[in-house]
Amino acid sequence: MYVNDEGILTSEFTLTDRHQGPPGHAHGGASAAILDEVMGLVVWAAGHKVLAANININYRKPLPLHQPLLAEARITEVAERKIISEGKIILPDSTVAVEGSGVYVIASRFFEKAIMNGANS
């Protein structure tokens, strides 16, 4: 995973049999989890401590198992207490298979309190 100079986070991955939904293809929940992860991570990489408030996923094509796939995410809006990001999963032929957007709320106090109470240690 890396974030380029334009703020786009990119991650290459391959789904396996344990991610299967329909025969030979990924379960939709696996796709949603991947997009939630990259859409949230691009916000964290920009220095914001956030929690997901809403994610929206649009399935365009099924994701094949055992093939290299690409996930990308970028921040599209920064407001006072919320940040919106968008993500997509791209097939080997460059077709966008799954798209999503996420609304993340800034929750710095939540994380500061958790750290002071010994969480994540």
Task: Specify the residue positions occupied by each region the protein language model found.
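Hydrophobic beta-strand-centered segment that forms part of the acyl-chain substrate-binding groove
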Residues: 37-70
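Non-catalytic linker/capping segments at the edges of enzyme domains
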Residues: 1-12, 16-17, 120-121
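HotDog/MaoC-like acyl-thioester-processing domains
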Residues: 63-65, 76-121
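Hydrophobic residues in beta-strands and at strand termini
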Residues: 13-15, 59, 106
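A conserved, well-ordered hydrophobic junction motif at loop->secondary-structure transitions
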Residues: 10-34
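Conserved positions in beta-strands of structured domains
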Residues: 2, 58-60, 72-76, 90
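Hydrophobic core residues within well-ordered beta-strands of beta-rich domains
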Residues: 7-9, 51, 69, 83, ...
